[in-house]
Structures are given as structure tokens and as C-alpha cells.
Amino acid sequence: MAPKADPARRVVADNRKARFHYEITDTVEAGIALTGTEVKSLRGGKATIGEAYAGPSGDEFFLFNAYIPEYLEANRFNHETKRPRRLLLHRRQINKFLGATQREGYTVIPLKIYFNERGRAKVELGLGRGKKLHDKRETAKERDWQRDKARLMRDKG
């Protein structure tokens, strides 16, 4: 059975391929600076972060290429769907990400967008390095073996 979901943490968008394409070494929770129509649209649950990434712009970090659809009930005051969104991080976290991305070849990838128990929109960021093709094959083999092992244990037991 799947583990029970945390009722206080409602996931809006999930980047499921990130863990396949990247070796995630560290995760951090960050806030997102959003407009009112973006929050209302996120509550509808139609956001996409499959092609999104986080990067520096000046001395701040932004979430680029994240798609939040327009809010249908809004009129001319709607938001731009793929605009850069400022991430709310501590200075120490920003410096850590800057060092890792500039020197060590890491990438900052959004893993999830969710609402916390206080109703604030948060993004879970992962610091990761891209996997090579043979690493992806090993990951797929390991996943298949775990599935087969569980199936054998279930059928024998």
C-alpha cells in the first residue's frame, strides 16, 4: 500500500522525472513570490514544473520556466504563465546554491510545489547533478529488481 499523504501538505505539482534524470544530493524548502491570480490558479492544481529550473539572477534565485496557467475568472489583471518567480531563500542557502552551480556543475531543480499547513505556496528544491545514460539504466534495473523481489515475496508468502 502507498503511504498516507500528509493532509497539511497538499501537493499541486510534482516533478517525477527529476529523480530519474538527476542525482539529487540535497533538498531545501523555499517560498515563492506569487501574484494573487497565480495563487488562485495553483489552488486549481494545473501547474507544470517538468521543464522548470531555478537559477540566480543578480543576488537572488528565481524559478524559471514553471508553467502556472492563467486564472480563468480573472480579467485583464491576469498573470504571465511562464514568468520568472522569485524564490524566498535565506542568504546562506543562496550562497550554497551559487557555489554548487558555479563551481561543481550542479543544477537546482524544483521537485514539488505544494501548500503548507498555513496555506502558503512552497517549492521543494533539489540540488542535483545530471545522470549519464548508464546511470539511468542502472536506476531502471534496480527499480525492476525491487519490483520483482516484492512480487516473489508476495507470491511465496
Curated annotation (Swiss-Prot):
Compartments where found: Cytoplasm
Upper taxonomic lineage: Bacteria, Pseudomonadati, Pseudomonadota, Alphaproteobacteria, Hyphomicrobiales
Role description: Required for rescue of stalled ribosomes mediated by trans-translation. Binds to transfer-messenger RNA (tmRNA), required for stable association of tmRNA with ribosomes. tmRNA and SmpB together mimic tRNA shape, replacing the anticodon stem-loop with SmpB. tmRNA is encoded by the ssrA gene; the 2 termini fold to resemble tRNA(Ala) and it encodes a 'tag peptide', a short internal open reading frame. During trans-translation Ala-aminoacylated tmRNA acts like a tRNA, entering the A-site of stalled ribosomes, displacing the stalled mRNA.
Record's keyword terms, sorted: Cytoplasm, RNA-binding
Positions with biased composition (Basic and acidic residues): 135-157
PROSITE patterns, per database record: SSRP (PS01317)
Family in the record: Belongs to the SmpB family.
GO molecular function per UniProt: RNA binding
Gene that encodes the chain: smpB
Gene Ontology biological process terms in this record: trans-translation
Transmembrane segments: none
Disordered as annotated region, ranges: 133-157
Protein name: SsrA-binding protein
Disulfide bonds: none
Any one cellular-component term (Gene Ontology): cytosol
Species the sequence originates in: Methylobacterium sp. (strain 4-46)
